Amino acid sequence: MDNNVDTITLTDEEGKETEFEVITKLDIEDKEYVVVVPKNEEVDEAIALRIDNNDNGEEVLVPVEEDEEFNMVAEAYELLFSEE
């Protein structure tokens, strides 16, 4: 995923599209992640997504659902933004 992406549009299982603002991209243990927030909604929680490749080699965004992996991303995010 390009580092200069400001927004992305994701489609859920029901076909509903939602635009997200990309807060940051993180590289952790040979994996790439993006942290996003819904662009036009009043939500304080960020969403962590892992960048994977599908069978065709195309990048896909996968929600981080495992607690250990989520905590690792959250820690890196907090460390990055605590330095600012």
Curated annotation (Swiss-Prot):
Top-level lineage group: Bacteria
Record family assignment: Belongs to the UPF0473 family.
Full protein name: UPF0473 protein CBO2561/CLC_2432
Species this protein is from: Clostridium botulinum (strain Hall / ATCC 3502 / NCTC 13319 / Type A)
Source taxonomy: Bacteria, Bacillati, Bacillota, Clostridia, Eubacteriales
